[in-house]
Amino acid sequence: MKIDLNTIFPSSCKEYIPGKIYKNIKIGMRKVSFNNDTESILIYDTGGPHSDQDIQTNINNGIKKLRVNWITDRQDVEYYDRHTINTNSSTAFPLQNNKALKSKNDKPVTQMFYAKNNIITPEMEYVAIRENSLIQKLLSHTPNTIIPEITPELVRQEVAAGRAIIPANINHPESEPMIIGKNFLVKINANIGNSAVSSDINNEVYKMIYAIIYGADTVMDLSTGSHIHNTREWIIRNSPVPIGTVPIYQALNKVNGIVGELNFNIFKETLIEQAEQGVDYFTIHAGVLKKYIQYTTNRLTGIVSRGGAIIAQWCSIHNKENFLYTNFEEICDIMKSYDIAFSLGDGLRPGSIADANDKAQFLELKTLGELTDIAWKHDCQVMIEGPGHVPMHLIKENVEKQMYFCKEAPFYTLGPLTTDIAPGYDHITSAIGAAMIGWYGTSMLCYVTPKEHLGLPNLNDVKNGVITYKIAAHAADLAKGNPSAYIRDYALSYARFNFRWYDQFNLSLDPETAKSFHDESLPSEHAKSAHFCSMCGPKFCSMKLTHQLQLNSTE
């Protein structure tokens, strides 16, 4: 499948900004040139080499291992033979490495460990430069404004305090560092993955590429069908963004879907297997305690988290406490050896408006706060997953409780959906909640596609989900006063008022769609310089009338 970058992002090219502390690092941005050829702006870009027109990528080869030297130069890791590698299968990634990296002497190799020890890593400088992508442009428009710059030292402080994470497994050197935290740009995640009904590795890889080109900051592989290991290997080797998983899915697959046969040893084996591949963050449902399950029985929709339901059933079958909870410190030992971030799962999240903000949900959240403290003692990076289905008036309470219980660890929410009545449009019902919860302080938003509750998303659904959530995240950034967000709105509005149609299209989140809508009624090239559109026509265009008014006032 060929992706035409000239069609997706016209008048754009990749530009690389060098580091100042680490001179050898180069941060890729998307440069959008204006039609007058004298101005341009740099936009945060998540596509890696896939969005660079000068690089020919081939999914059979994977992408450049950007961070190998950064990782090995710290001299705190060593190579060893991977426990699980699958090279004989017809679906195996052709260039698998039979070696993996791990920390030496069981010492932490996490970004949090370095941050606590006052070390600014290349990853920290990288994300600081990315976050500042549009600030210089804003300064040129408002020279007397004092704008706080995001510095590598600020990044270090936020990571050390646990208010931000940089998911960056040492076995995923292809990843371009990014940061998740309430004092940075709101990020979005795209879920992909096969199912028992539909399994195609190439299709999942292209879903990942499609998602990141359009702006997904991380991707979760939630595969539950065939070839889970190999699907993940292909995705990671081609991904410049952090990859997350829910390891309990593969652990259950290993026991043929029989929940009662799950145990911690199988789960631990799965964690190490995925750690060696390079997974950057794990969803771990360690907060689903046996005593909380009783509070879900009177819910309208019960337990809707797949991981939460698996753990609840296991506890019920064995009449034992959640083995993820009882073995949590051993899990921390694995995480800190590879720098895998925790995404503490909300296994008891509400699956309907009727169940929002109930006792089960908030009991689990409190436990996640306690687990966060334990993980931090091991220097593990942590973010907290959140709901779900929540009406607008109850959204703020979720953020307030999460900030209190979890001491401002980054919040990562699925929407939330603000109503249950719109199957087929749940990307919209959830984007309403996502924009609000992002404004209140959530750090990352998990996208919802139009197929939510209905089926497995295809490429077009992935695009629609990503664009919808880029809108929600950007709206939240504007509301929070993030200076990097403002300049793009300013530039597009300026182009709109001056009837610079191509600049309007090219500055938008989806230039191809914007231009196609304009072409439906005014397809000619002449119309691309017209001082009206088909909505108002030449006589009723308010902006054209305003231009005339301004002209008259100066005469």
Swiss-Prot record:
Q: Which domain of life is it from?
A: Bacteria
Residues that, per the record, bind Zn(2+): H389, H453
Report the enzyme's class at the first EC level: lyase
Q: Which Gene3D superfamilies match?
A: 6.10.250.620, Radical SAM ThiC family, central domain (3.20.20.540)
For the ligand ([4Fe-4S] cluster), the binding residues are C533, C536, C541
What EC number(s) does the entry state?
4.1.99.17
The record's annotation in InterPro entries points to: ThiC (IPR037509), ThiC-associated_dom (IPR025747), ThiC/Bza_core_dom (IPR038521), ThiC/BzaA/B (IPR002817)
Gene Ontology cellular component terms for the protein in this record: cytosol
A Pfam cross-reference name? ThiC_Rad_SAM
Q: Name one GO biological process term.
A: thiamine biosynthetic process
Cofactor(s) the protein needs: [4Fe-4S] cluster
Instruction: Report residues binding substrate.
Output: N191, M220, Y249, H285, S305, R306, G307, D346, G347, L348, R349, E385, Y412
Q: Give the metabolic or biological pathway.
A: Cofactor biosynthesis; thiamine diphosphate biosynthesis
Q: GO molecular-function annotation terms?
A: 4 iron, 4 sulfur cluster binding; carbon-carbon lyase activity; zinc ion binding
The entry's free-text remark on the cofactor is: Binds 1 [4Fe-4S] cluster per subunit. The cluster is coordinated with 3 cysteines and an exchangeable S-adenosyl-L-methionine.
**Any idea which UniProt keywords this protein has?**
4Fe-4S, Iron, Iron-sulfur, Lyase, Metal-binding, S-adenosyl-L-methionine, Thiamine biosynthesis, Zinc
Question: Reaction(s) catalyzed by this protein?
Answer: 5-amino-1-(5-phospho-beta-D-ribosyl)imidazole + S-adenosyl-L-methionine = 4-amino-2-methyl-5-(phosphooxymethyl)pyrimidine + CO + 5'-deoxyadenosine + formate + L-methionine + 3 H(+)
PANTHER family associated with the record: PHOSPHOMETHYLPYRIMIDINE SYNTHASE, CHLOROPLASTIC, THIAMINE BIOSYNTHESIS PROTEIN THIC
The Swiss-Prot or TrEMBL record describes its family as follows:
Belongs to the ThiC family.
The protein's assembly and partners: Homodimer.
What does this gene product do? Catalyzes the synthesis of the hydroxymethylpyrimidine phosphate (HMP-P) moiety of thiamine from aminoimidazole ribotide (AIR) in a radical S-adenosyl-L-methionine (SAM)-dependent reaction.
What protein is this chain from? Phosphomethylpyrimidine synthase
Q: Which organism is it from?
A: Ehrlichia ruminantium (strain Gardel)
Instruction: State the taxonomy lineage.
Output: Bacteria, Pseudomonadati, Pseudomonadota, Alphaproteobacteria, Rickettsiales
